[in-house]
Swiss-Prot record:
Pfam families: XK-related (PF09815). One of its GO terms (biological process) is phosphatidylserine exposure on apoptotic cell surface. GO terms for cellular component: plasma membrane. This is XK-related protein 7. Keywords: Cell membrane, Membrane, Transmembrane, Transmembrane helix. Residues 1-18 have a biased composition (Low complexity). InterPro entries: XK-rel (IPR018629), XK-related_scramblase (IPR050895). The chain crosses the membrane at residues 59-79, 89-109, 260-280, 314-334, 355-375, 384-404, 415-435. Residues 1-40, 146-165, 466-510 are annotated as: Disordered. The keyword Transmembrane helix applies. It comes from the Eukaryota. It is a multi-pass membrane protein. Coiled coil: none annotated. The gene is XKR7.
Length: 579
Protein backbone atom coordinates (compact mmCIF):
# COMPACT_ATOMS: atom_id res chain seq x y z
CA UNK A 1 0.00 0.00 0.00
CA UNK A 2 0.95 3.64 -0.18
CA UNK A 3 -0.05 6.60 1.93
CA UNK A 4 -1.65 9.26 -0.21
CA UNK A 5 -1.76 12.83 0.94
CA UNK A 6 -5.47 13.09 0.20
CA UNK A 7 -6.38 10.84 3.08
CA UNK A 8 -6.11 7.38 1.55
CA UNK A 9 -4.58 4.45 3.38
CA UNK A 10 -0.90 4.61 4.18
CA UNK A 11 1.37 1.73 4.98
CA UNK A 12 4.95 0.63 5.17
CA UNK A 13 6.94 -2.25 3.82
CA UNK A 14 10.61 -3.20 4.21
CA UNK A 15 12.86 -0.87 2.27
CA UNK A 16 14.18 -2.83 -0.71
CA UNK A 17 17.00 -0.39 -1.11
CA UNK A 18 18.33 -0.97 2.36
CA UNK A 19 19.84 1.99 4.03
CA UNK A 20 20.96 3.76 0.87
CA UNK A 21 19.64 7.16 -0.13
CA UNK A 22 17.72 8.49 2.82
CA UNK A 23 17.69 12.25 2.68
CA UNK A 24 14.60 13.97 3.84
CA UNK A 25 13.14 15.76 0.85
CA UNK A 26 10.17 17.28 -0.75
CA UNK A 27 7.92 16.94 -3.75
CA UNK A 28 6.19 19.13 -6.22
CA UNK A 29 2.61 18.07 -5.60
CA UNK A 30 0.36 15.63 -3.86
CA UNK A 31 2.02 12.29 -3.82
CA UNK A 32 2.22 8.92 -2.19
CA UNK A 33 4.18 8.14 0.95
CA UNK A 34 5.19 4.79 2.30
CA UNK A 35 7.15 4.03 5.44
CA UNK A 36 9.66 1.24 5.54
CA UNK A 37 11.62 -0.01 8.50
CA UNK A 38 15.29 -0.51 8.90
CA UNK A 39 17.10 -2.97 11.14
CA UNK A 40 15.19 -4.08 14.21
CA UNK A 41 16.00 -2.43 17.48
CA UNK A 42 17.45 0.73 15.93
CA UNK A 43 16.00 3.79 17.68
CA UNK A 44 16.98 7.27 16.63
CA UNK A 45 19.56 6.04 14.15
CA UNK A 46 21.82 8.56 12.54
CA UNK A 47 22.83 10.70 15.51
CA UNK A 48 21.02 13.21 17.66
CA UNK A 49 20.17 15.61 14.84
CA UNK A 50 19.38 19.33 15.29
CA UNK A 51 18.49 20.65 18.72
CA UNK A 52 16.38 23.60 19.82
CA UNK A 53 18.65 26.13 21.51
CA UNK A 54 18.21 29.20 23.67
CA UNK A 55 18.97 31.56 20.80
CA UNK A 56 16.12 29.98 18.81
CA UNK A 57 13.80 30.88 21.67
CA UNK A 58 15.15 34.45 21.78
CA UNK A 59 14.62 34.77 18.02
CA UNK A 60 10.93 33.87 18.38
CA UNK A 61 10.52 36.31 21.27
CA UNK A 62 12.09 39.08 19.18
CA UNK A 63 9.72 38.22 16.33
CA UNK A 64 6.79 38.61 18.74
CA UNK A 65 8.17 41.97 19.87
CA UNK A 66 8.44 43.17 16.27
CA UNK A 67 4.89 41.98 15.54
CA UNK A 68 3.35 43.79 18.52
CA UNK A 69 5.34 46.99 18.01
CA UNK A 70 4.29 47.21 14.37
CA UNK A 71 0.60 46.69 15.08
CA UNK A 72 0.50 48.86 18.21
CA UNK A 73 2.17 51.88 16.60
CA UNK A 74 -0.14 51.71 13.58
CA UNK A 75 -3.27 51.56 15.74
CA UNK A 76 -1.96 54.32 17.98
CA UNK A 77 -1.26 56.50 14.96
CA UNK A 78 -4.74 55.83 13.53
CA UNK A 79 -6.30 56.88 16.84
CA UNK A 80 -4.18 60.03 16.80
CA UNK A 81 -5.41 60.93 13.32
CA UNK A 82 -8.99 60.39 14.43
CA UNK A 83 -8.59 62.65 17.46
CA UNK A 84 -7.06 65.34 15.21
CA UNK A 85 -10.08 65.10 12.85
CA UNK A 86 -7.86 63.93 9.99
CA UNK A 87 -10.39 61.35 8.85
CA UNK A 88 -8.75 60.63 5.48
CA UNK A 89 -5.43 59.68 7.03
CA UNK A 90 -7.27 57.81 9.77
CA UNK A 91 -9.20 55.75 7.21
CA UNK A 92 -6.12 54.92 5.13
CA UNK A 93 -4.02 53.98 8.15
CA UNK A 94 -6.76 51.79 9.61
CA UNK A 95 -7.47 50.21 6.20
CA UNK A 96 -3.84 49.16 5.79
CA UNK A 97 -4.01 47.57 9.25
CA UNK A 98 -7.34 45.75 9.19
CA UNK A 99 -7.64 44.48 5.60
CA UNK A 100 -4.33 42.54 5.49
CA UNK A 101 -4.95 41.26 9.01
CA UNK A 102 -8.36 39.89 8.03
CA UNK A 103 -6.92 38.17 4.95
CA UNK A 104 -4.13 36.55 6.96
CA UNK A 105 -6.45 35.48 9.80
CA UNK A 106 -8.83 33.83 7.33
CA UNK A 107 -5.95 31.93 5.77
CA UNK A 108 -4.60 30.91 9.17
CA UNK A 109 -8.02 29.74 10.37
CA UNK A 110 -8.48 27.77 7.14
CA UNK A 111 -5.23 25.96 7.87
CA UNK A 112 -6.39 25.26 11.42
CA UNK A 113 -9.72 23.86 10.20
CA UNK A 114 -7.97 21.42 7.93
CA UNK A 115 -5.32 20.43 10.48
CA UNK A 116 -7.87 19.67 13.21
CA UNK A 117 -10.68 18.28 11.09
CA UNK A 118 -11.32 14.54 10.92
CA UNK A 119 -12.57 12.46 7.99
CA UNK A 120 -16.23 11.60 8.02
CA UNK A 121 -17.05 8.32 9.68
CA UNK A 122 -13.77 8.05 11.57
CA UNK A 123 -12.60 9.42 14.89
CA UNK A 124 -9.15 9.94 13.45
CA UNK A 125 -6.39 8.26 11.51
CA UNK A 126 -5.88 4.75 12.81
CA UNK A 127 -2.26 3.84 13.27
CA UNK A 128 -0.78 0.46 14.07
CA UNK A 129 2.65 -1.08 14.32
CA UNK A 130 3.44 -4.61 13.22
CA UNK A 131 6.43 -6.84 12.59
CA UNK A 132 7.24 -7.49 8.98
CA UNK A 133 8.57 -10.75 7.61
CA UNK A 134 11.99 -9.23 7.13
CA UNK A 135 12.24 -8.49 10.81
CA UNK A 136 11.68 -4.74 10.65
CA UNK A 137 8.88 -2.64 11.99
CA UNK A 138 6.22 -1.74 9.48
CA UNK A 139 3.76 1.11 9.88
CA UNK A 140 0.21 1.26 8.60
CA UNK A 141 -2.43 3.97 8.79
CA UNK A 142 -5.99 4.26 7.58
CA UNK A 143 -8.26 7.25 7.62
CA UNK A 144 -11.43 5.23 7.23
CA UNK A 145 -13.22 3.27 9.92
CA UNK A 146 -12.39 -0.38 10.37
CA UNK A 147 -9.58 -2.67 11.41
CA UNK A 148 -5.96 -2.62 10.32
CA UNK A 149 -4.55 -4.62 7.50
CA UNK A 150 -2.22 -7.32 8.73
CA UNK A 151 0.20 -9.81 7.29
CA UNK A 152 -0.15 -13.52 7.83
CA UNK A 153 1.94 -14.84 10.69
CA UNK A 154 2.67 -11.41 12.16
CA UNK A 155 1.58 -10.62 15.69
CA UNK A 156 -1.21 -8.07 15.60
CA UNK A 157 -3.19 -6.65 18.48
CA UNK A 158 -6.35 -6.83 16.41
CA UNK A 159 -9.08 -4.19 16.05
CA UNK A 160 -8.89 -1.36 18.52
CA UNK A 161 -11.56 -1.54 21.22
CA UNK A 162 -14.30 1.04 21.02
CA UNK A 163 -13.66 3.96 23.37
CA UNK A 164 -15.82 4.21 26.44
CA UNK A 165 -18.56 6.78 26.67
CA UNK A 166 -16.65 8.76 29.30
CA UNK A 167 -13.47 8.99 27.22
CA UNK A 168 -15.46 9.85 24.10
CA UNK A 169 -17.26 12.60 26.02
CA UNK A 170 -13.98 14.02 27.32
CA UNK A 171 -12.55 13.89 23.82
CA UNK A 172 -15.49 15.81 22.36
CA UNK A 173 -15.28 18.40 25.12
CA UNK A 174 -11.57 18.85 24.49
CA UNK A 175 -12.08 19.31 20.76
CA UNK A 176 -14.89 21.79 21.39
CA UNK A 177 -12.66 23.84 23.67
CA UNK A 178 -9.89 23.87 21.06
CA UNK A 179 -12.29 25.05 18.36
CA UNK A 180 -13.72 27.78 20.60
CA UNK A 181 -10.24 28.93 21.60
CA UNK A 182 -8.98 29.07 18.02
CA UNK A 183 -12.11 30.91 16.88
CA UNK A 184 -11.66 33.50 19.61
CA UNK A 185 -7.95 33.87 18.88
CA UNK A 186 -8.53 34.49 15.18
CA UNK A 187 -11.43 36.87 15.83
CA UNK A 188 -9.06 38.91 17.99
CA UNK A 189 -6.56 38.92 15.08
CA UNK A 190 -4.03 36.96 17.13
CA UNK A 191 -3.65 33.86 14.98
CA UNK A 192 0.01 34.55 14.30
CA UNK A 193 0.69 35.16 17.99
CA UNK A 194 -0.79 31.76 18.77
CA UNK A 195 1.41 30.13 16.14
CA UNK A 196 4.52 31.86 17.48
CA UNK A 197 3.74 30.68 21.02
CA UNK A 198 3.00 27.16 19.82
CA UNK A 199 6.28 27.03 17.88
CA UNK A 200 8.04 28.18 21.06
CA UNK A 201 6.27 25.50 23.12
CA UNK A 202 7.07 22.74 20.63
CA UNK A 203 10.69 23.83 20.48
CA UNK A 204 11.03 23.71 24.27
CA UNK A 205 9.31 20.32 24.36
CA UNK A 206 11.78 18.99 21.80
CA UNK A 207 14.58 20.15 24.07
CA UNK A 208 13.19 18.50 27.22
CA UNK A 209 11.90 15.20 25.84
CA UNK A 210 13.65 11.95 24.96
CA UNK A 211 15.27 11.22 21.61
CA UNK A 212 12.22 9.90 19.71
CA UNK A 213 9.77 12.48 21.08
CA UNK A 214 12.39 15.16 20.64
CA UNK A 215 12.49 14.56 16.90
CA UNK A 216 8.68 14.45 16.76
CA UNK A 217 8.31 17.82 18.51
CA UNK A 218 11.13 19.29 16.43
CA UNK A 219 9.31 18.33 13.22
CA UNK A 220 6.12 19.93 14.50
CA UNK A 221 8.04 23.06 15.50
CA UNK A 222 9.44 23.34 11.97
CA UNK A 223 5.95 22.98 10.50
CA UNK A 224 4.57 25.69 12.78
CA UNK A 225 7.52 28.01 12.11
CA UNK A 226 7.04 27.56 8.36
CA UNK A 227 3.34 28.43 8.64
CA UNK A 228 3.88 31.57 10.67
CA UNK A 229 6.77 32.76 8.47
CA UNK A 230 4.62 32.48 5.34
CA UNK A 231 1.73 34.27 7.05
CA UNK A 232 3.99 37.06 8.27
CA UNK A 233 5.56 37.50 4.84
CA UNK A 234 2.13 37.94 3.29
CA UNK A 235 0.92 40.32 5.98
CA UNK A 236 3.95 42.58 6.11
CA UNK A 237 3.96 43.30 2.39
CA UNK A 238 0.21 43.90 2.40
CA UNK A 239 0.25 46.05 5.55
CA UNK A 240 3.67 47.36 6.55
CA UNK A 241 4.90 48.18 3.03
CA UNK A 242 2.00 50.49 2.03
CA UNK A 243 1.94 51.87 5.58
CA UNK A 244 5.61 52.77 5.26
CA UNK A 245 5.07 54.66 2.00
CA UNK A 246 1.96 56.43 3.34
CA UNK A 247 3.55 57.70 6.54
CA UNK A 248 6.78 58.70 4.80
CA UNK A 249 4.77 60.65 2.22
CA UNK A 250 2.94 62.50 4.98
CA UNK A 251 6.20 63.29 6.75
CA UNK A 252 7.78 64.62 3.54
CA UNK A 253 4.67 66.63 2.68
CA UNK A 254 4.61 68.33 6.07
CA UNK A 255 8.34 69.03 6.12
CA UNK A 256 10.32 70.10 9.12
CA UNK A 257 11.08 67.89 12.10
CA UNK A 258 8.94 64.72 12.06
CA UNK A 259 6.46 64.03 14.84
CA UNK A 260 7.27 61.24 17.26
CA UNK A 261 4.29 58.98 16.59
CA UNK A 262 4.53 58.88 12.75
CA UNK A 263 8.27 58.34 13.07
CA UNK A 264 7.71 55.39 15.43
CA UNK A 265 5.13 53.87 13.10
CA UNK A 266 7.44 54.25 10.11
CA UNK A 267 10.37 52.72 11.96
CA UNK A 268 8.27 49.79 13.19
CA UNK A 269 6.99 49.08 9.68
CA UNK A 270 10.52 49.19 8.29
CA UNK A 271 11.91 46.84 10.94
CA UNK A 272 8.96 44.48 10.46
CA UNK A 273 9.64 44.20 6.73
CA UNK A 274 13.35 43.54 7.17
CA UNK A 275 12.85 41.08 10.04
CA UNK A 276 10.17 39.10 8.23
CA UNK A 277 12.32 38.62 5.13
CA UNK A 278 15.31 37.42 7.15
CA UNK A 279 13.16 35.16 9.33
CA UNK A 280 11.51 33.63 6.26
CA UNK A 281 14.86 32.76 4.71
CA UNK A 282 16.16 31.30 7.97
CA UNK A 283 13.14 29.03 8.50
CA UNK A 284 13.23 27.97 4.84
CA UNK A 285 16.87 26.89 5.11
CA UNK A 286 16.32 25.22 8.47
CA UNK A 287 13.51 23.14 6.99
CA UNK A 288 15.67 21.67 4.22
CA UNK A 289 18.43 19.24 5.09
CA UNK A 290 19.95 19.57 1.62
CA UNK A 291 20.92 23.15 2.49
CA UNK A 292 23.14 24.49 5.20
CA UNK A 293 21.22 26.35 7.92
CA UNK A 294 21.40 30.13 8.03
CA UNK A 295 23.37 31.33 11.04
CA UNK A 296 22.08 34.12 13.24
CA UNK A 297 24.96 36.33 12.12
CA UNK A 298 23.80 35.83 8.55
CA UNK A 299 20.20 36.53 9.58
CA UNK A 300 21.22 39.82 11.24
CA UNK A 301 23.19 40.75 8.11
CA UNK A 302 20.07 40.07 6.05
CA UNK A 303 18.01 42.25 8.40
CA UNK A 304 20.43 45.16 7.93
CA UNK A 305 20.59 44.55 4.17
CA UNK A 306 16.82 44.70 3.74
CA UNK A 307 16.44 47.46 6.33
CA UNK A 308 18.56 49.98 4.43
CA UNK A 309 17.46 48.84 0.96
CA UNK A 310 13.76 49.12 1.78
CA UNK A 311 14.36 52.43 3.58
CA UNK A 312 15.92 53.92 0.45
CA UNK A 313 13.17 52.48 -1.72
CA UNK A 314 10.36 53.68 0.53
CA UNK A 315 11.83 57.16 0.88
CA UNK A 316 12.22 57.50 -2.90
CA UNK A 317 8.58 56.45 -3.27
CA UNK A 318 7.48 58.94 -0.62
CA UNK A 319 9.37 61.84 -2.20
CA UNK A 320 7.91 61.20 -5.63
CA UNK A 321 4.38 60.52 -4.32
CA UNK A 322 4.33 63.76 -2.33
CA UNK A 323 4.42 65.70 -5.62
CA UNK A 324 3.17 63.37 -8.39
CA UNK A 325 0.45 61.21 -6.82
CA UNK A 326 -1.17 60.06 -10.08
CA UNK A 327 2.10 59.22 -11.78
CA UNK A 328 3.25 57.38 -8.68
CA UNK A 329 0.20 55.11 -8.87
CA UNK A 330 0.87 54.43 -12.55
CA UNK A 331 4.52 53.67 -11.81
CA UNK A 332 3.65 51.20 -9.02
CA UNK A 333 1.15 49.32 -11.18
CA UNK A 334 3.54 49.18 -14.14
CA UNK A 335 6.43 47.99 -11.97
CA UNK A 336 4.25 45.32 -10.36
CA UNK A 337 3.08 44.04 -13.76
CA UNK A 338 6.61 43.84 -15.13
CA UNK A 339 7.94 42.06 -12.06
CA UNK A 340 5.01 39.64 -11.93
CA UNK A 341 5.52 38.65 -15.57
CA UNK A 342 9.23 38.27 -14.90
CA UNK A 343 8.49 35.88 -12.04
CA UNK A 344 5.95 33.93 -14.11
CA UNK A 345 8.44 33.66 -16.96
CA UNK A 346 10.88 32.08 -14.51
CA UNK A 347 8.43 29.15 -14.00
CA UNK A 348 8.42 28.97 -10.23
CA UNK A 349 7.46 25.76 -8.45
CA UNK A 350 6.07 26.78 -5.07
CA UNK A 351 2.40 25.84 -4.73
CA UNK A 352 0.38 22.68 -5.31
CA UNK A 353 -1.87 23.96 -8.11
CA UNK A 354 -1.62 26.27 -11.09
CA UNK A 355 -3.92 28.97 -9.70
CA UNK A 356 -2.19 29.01 -6.33
CA UNK A 357 1.10 29.41 -8.18
CA UNK A 358 -0.28 32.42 -10.08
CA UNK A 359 -1.44 34.05 -6.83
CA UNK A 360 1.96 33.38 -5.31
CA UNK A 361 3.67 35.02 -8.30
CA UNK A 362 1.43 38.07 -7.87
CA UNK A 363 2.45 38.35 -4.21
CA UNK A 364 6.11 38.04 -5.19
CA UNK A 365 5.51 40.86 -7.67
CA UNK A 366 4.43 43.02 -4.72
CA UNK A 367 7.59 42.06 -2.85
CA UNK A 368 9.70 42.99 -5.86
CA UNK A 369 8.33 46.53 -5.67
CA UNK A 370 10.39 47.03 -2.53
CA UNK A 371 13.23 44.52 -2.38
CA UNK A 372 14.92 41.46 -3.85
CA UNK A 373 13.37 38.03 -3.22
CA UNK A 374 14.90 34.90 -4.70
CA UNK A 375 12.28 32.53 -6.16
CA UNK A 376 14.29 30.44 -8.62
CA UNK A 377 16.80 27.68 -8.02
CA UNK A 378 20.30 28.11 -9.33
CA UNK A 379 22.82 30.90 -9.45
CA UNK A 380 20.94 34.15 -8.93
CA UNK A 381 23.90 36.52 -9.28
CA UNK A 382 22.91 37.86 -12.69
CA UNK A 383 19.24 38.20 -11.83
CA UNK A 384 20.05 39.92 -8.54
CA UNK A 385 22.50 42.30 -10.23
CA UNK A 386 19.96 43.17 -12.91
CA UNK A 387 17.27 43.80 -10.32
CA UNK A 388 19.44 46.10 -8.20
CA UNK A 389 20.52 48.03 -11.29
CA UNK A 390 16.86 48.59 -12.16
CA UNK A 391 16.08 49.65 -8.59
CA UNK A 392 19.05 52.04 -8.58
CA UNK A 393 17.87 53.70 -11.79
CA UNK A 394 14.30 53.93 -10.52
CA UNK A 395 15.35 55.42 -7.19
CA UNK A 396 17.55 57.96 -8.97
CA UNK A 397 14.75 58.90 -11.39
CA UNK A 398 12.07 59.21 -8.69
CA UNK A 399 14.32 61.26 -6.42
CA UNK A 400 15.50 63.38 -9.35
CA UNK A 401 11.96 64.27 -10.42
CA UNK A 402 11.10 65.28 -6.86
CA UNK A 403 14.32 67.29 -6.51
CA UNK A 404 13.66 69.13 -9.77
CA UNK A 405 10.31 70.33 -8.42
CA UNK A 406 11.98 71.94 -5.40
CA UNK A 407 13.78 75.24 -5.14
CA UNK A 408 17.14 73.58 -4.71
CA UNK A 409 19.05 76.85 -4.83
CA UNK A 410 17.78 77.78 -1.34
CA UNK A 411 16.32 74.50 -0.03
CA UNK A 412 19.05 72.63 1.83
CA UNK A 413 16.45 70.12 3.09
CA UNK A 414 16.04 68.69 -0.42
CA UNK A 415 19.74 67.99 -0.75
CA UNK A 416 19.72 66.18 2.60
CA UNK A 417 16.87 63.91 1.48
CA UNK A 418 18.70 63.03 -1.74
CA UNK A 419 21.81 62.14 0.26
CA UNK A 420 19.75 60.00 2.65
CA UNK A 421 18.30 57.99 -0.25
CA UNK A 422 21.72 57.45 -1.83
CA UNK A 423 23.51 56.57 1.41
CA UNK A 424 20.76 54.21 2.55
CA UNK A 425 20.85 52.31 -0.73
CA UNK A 426 24.66 52.14 -0.55
CA UNK A 427 24.50 50.74 2.99
CA UNK A 428 22.00 48.13 1.84
CA UNK A 429 24.34 47.01 -0.94
CA UNK A 430 27.23 46.96 1.54
CA UNK A 431 25.45 44.63 3.96
CA UNK A 432 24.33 42.47 1.06
CA UNK A 433 27.98 42.06 0.03
CA UNK A 434 28.92 41.33 3.65
CA UNK A 435 26.33 38.57 3.75
CA UNK A 436 27.33 36.96 0.47
CA UNK A 437 31.09 37.35 0.99
CA UNK A 438 31.37 36.41 4.66
CA UNK A 439 28.16 34.99 6.14
CA UNK A 440 26.48 32.95 3.42
CA UNK A 441 25.82 29.35 4.56
CA UNK A 442 27.67 27.93 1.54
CA UNK A 443 30.69 30.14 2.02
CA UNK A 444 31.79 33.19 -0.01
CA UNK A 445 29.53 33.51 -3.05
CA UNK A 446 30.85 36.68 -4.73
CA UNK A 447 34.53 35.73 -4.90
CA UNK A 448 36.28 33.77 -7.66
CA UNK A 449 35.06 30.19 -7.73
CA UNK A 450 34.89 27.34 -10.18
CA UNK A 451 31.65 27.09 -12.14
CA UNK A 452 29.31 24.53 -10.73
CA UNK A 453 31.03 24.24 -7.33
CA UNK A 454 29.17 24.89 -4.13
CA UNK A 455 32.08 24.73 -1.71
CA UNK A 456 35.42 26.43 -2.18
CA UNK A 457 37.41 23.34 -1.21
CA UNK A 458 36.17 20.48 -3.32
CA UNK A 459 37.72 17.06 -3.15
CA UNK A 460 37.24 16.53 -6.87
CA UNK A 461 36.74 18.87 -9.81
CA UNK A 462 33.17 19.89 -10.46
CA UNK A 463 33.32 19.29 -14.16
CA UNK A 464 32.93 15.88 -15.79
CA UNK A 465 36.01 13.65 -16.09
CA UNK A 466 38.14 13.95 -19.16
CA UNK A 467 37.19 10.48 -20.39
CA UNK A 468 33.47 11.02 -19.92
CA UNK A 469 31.25 10.70 -22.94
CA UNK A 470 29.60 14.08 -23.34
CA UNK A 471 27.41 13.43 -26.39
CA UNK A 472 25.98 10.41 -28.16
CA UNK A 473 27.66 9.25 -31.37
CA UNK A 474 26.06 10.73 -34.43
CA UNK A 475 26.82 7.69 -36.61
CA UNK A 476 28.34 4.24 -36.38
CA UNK A 477 31.12 3.95 -39.04
CA UNK A 478 31.53 0.61 -40.74
CA UNK A 479 34.46 -1.45 -39.44
CA UNK A 480 37.23 -1.84 -42.03
CA UNK A 481 39.13 -5.06 -42.75
CA UNK A 482 42.39 -3.73 -41.27
CA UNK A 483 40.63 -2.81 -38.04
CA UNK A 484 38.99 -6.25 -37.94
CA UNK A 485 42.33 -8.00 -38.48
CA UNK A 486 43.99 -5.79 -35.87
CA UNK A 487 41.28 -6.52 -33.35
CA UNK A 488 41.64 -10.26 -33.97
CA UNK A 489 45.40 -10.10 -33.54
CA UNK A 490 44.95 -8.17 -30.31
CA UNK A 491 42.54 -10.72 -28.96
CA UNK A 492 44.94 -13.55 -29.86
CA UNK A 493 47.78 -11.77 -28.08
CA UNK A 494 45.69 -11.36 -24.96
CA UNK A 495 45.26 -7.59 -25.28
CA UNK A 496 42.20 -6.42 -23.28
CA UNK A 497 39.48 -4.99 -25.46
CA UNK A 498 37.36 -2.01 -24.46
CA UNK A 499 33.86 -2.80 -23.19
CA UNK A 500 31.07 -2.64 -25.69
CA UNK A 501 28.68 -0.83 -23.34
CA UNK A 502 29.74 1.98 -21.06
CA UNK A 503 27.76 4.00 -18.53
CA UNK A 504 28.09 7.69 -19.11
CA UNK A 505 29.07 9.42 -15.85
CA UNK A 506 26.38 11.73 -14.59
CA UNK A 507 26.78 15.03 -12.80
CA UNK A 508 28.90 14.92 -9.65
CA UNK A 509 26.82 14.68 -6.51
CA UNK A 510 26.12 17.85 -4.61
CA UNK A 511 28.00 17.91 -1.31
CA UNK A 512 25.53 17.23 1.47
CA UNK A 513 25.14 20.19 3.78
CA UNK A 514 24.31 18.13 6.86
CA UNK A 515 24.99 14.65 8.14
CA UNK A 516 22.13 12.55 6.79
CA UNK A 517 20.78 9.46 8.46
CA UNK A 518 21.04 6.26 6.47
CA UNK A 519 19.47 3.87 8.96
CA UNK A 520 16.09 3.28 10.51
CA UNK A 521 12.59 3.67 9.08
CA UNK A 522 12.12 5.64 5.90
CA UNK A 523 9.00 7.37 4.57
CA UNK A 524 9.18 7.27 0.80
CA UNK A 525 7.25 9.84 -1.22
CA UNK A 526 6.76 8.99 -4.88
CA UNK A 527 7.43 12.50 -6.19
CA UNK A 528 10.55 14.43 -7.17
CA UNK A 529 11.86 16.93 -4.69
CA UNK A 530 11.18 20.60 -5.13
CA UNK A 531 14.23 22.69 -5.79
CA UNK A 532 15.37 25.38 -3.39
CA UNK A 533 14.15 28.09 -2.70
CA UNK A 534 10.77 26.35 -2.79
CA UNK A 535 9.38 24.73 0.33
CA UNK A 536 9.26 20.97 0.64
CA UNK A 537 5.93 19.42 -0.27
CA UNK A 538 5.21 18.22 3.27
CA UNK A 539 5.37 21.87 4.36
CA UNK A 540 2.93 23.06 1.68
CA UNK A 541 0.55 20.12 1.25
CA UNK A 542 -1.22 19.81 4.59
CA UNK A 543 -2.73 16.42 3.77
CA UNK A 544 0.71 15.02 3.08
CA UNK A 545 1.90 16.60 6.31
CA UNK A 546 -0.83 14.90 8.35
CA UNK A 547 0.00 11.52 6.84
CA UNK A 548 3.71 11.92 7.54
CA UNK A 549 3.09 12.97 11.14
CA UNK A 550 0.82 9.95 11.66
CA UNK A 551 3.45 7.58 10.28
CA UNK A 552 6.21 9.28 12.22
CA UNK A 553 4.34 9.19 15.54
CA UNK A 554 3.46 5.50 15.17
CA UNK A 555 7.00 4.42 14.31
CA UNK A 556 9.14 2.93 17.09
CA UNK A 557 12.10 4.85 15.64
CA UNK A 558 12.15 8.28 14.07
CA UNK A 559 11.76 7.86 10.30
CA UNK A 560 13.43 9.87 7.61
CA UNK A 561 11.83 11.18 4.45
CA UNK A 562 12.96 10.11 1.00
CA UNK A 563 11.63 11.57 -2.22
CA UNK A 564 11.87 10.07 -5.65
CA UNK A 565 15.13 10.66 -7.46
CA UNK A 566 14.74 12.56 -10.71
CA UNK A 567 17.61 10.70 -12.38
CA UNK A 568 16.17 7.23 -11.73
CA UNK A 569 13.42 7.51 -14.31
CA UNK A 570 15.94 8.41 -17.02
CA UNK A 571 18.49 5.74 -16.18
CA UNK A 572 18.30 4.16 -19.61
CA UNK A 573 19.23 7.47 -21.20
CA UNK A 574 22.64 7.27 -19.55
CA UNK A 575 23.73 4.22 -21.60
CA UNK A 576 25.50 4.55 -24.91
CA UNK A 577 27.14 2.13 -27.24
CA UNK A 578 30.81 2.54 -28.13
CA UNK A 579 31.08 0.04 -31.00
Amino acid sequence: MAAKSDGAAASASPDPEGAAGGARGSAGGRGEAAAAAGPPGVVGAGGPGPRYELRDCCWVLCALLVFFSDGATDLWLAASYYLQNQHTYFSLTLLFVLLPSLVVQLLSFRWFVYDYSEPAGSPGPAVSTKDSVAGGAAISTKDSAGAFRTKEGSPEPGPQPAPSSASAYRRRCCRLCIWLLQTLVHLLQLGQVWRYLRALYLGLQSRWRGERLRRHFYWQMLFESADVSMLRLLETFLRSAPQLVLQLSLLVHRGGAPDLLPALSTSASLVSLAWTLASYQKVLRDSRDDKRPLSYKGAVAQVLWHLFSIAARGLAFALFASVYKLYFGIFIVAHWCVMTFWVIQGETDFCMSKWEEIIYNMVVGIIYIFCWFNVKEGRSRRRMTLYHCIVLLENAALTGFWYSSRNFSTDFYSLIMVCVVASSFALGIFFMCVYYCLLHPNGPMLGPQAPGCIFRKASEPCGPPADAITSPPRSLPRTTGAERDGASAGERAGTPTPPVFQVRPGLPPTPVARTLRTEGPVIRIDLPRKKYPAWDAHFIDRRLRKTILALEYSSPATPRLQYRSVGTSQELLEYETTV
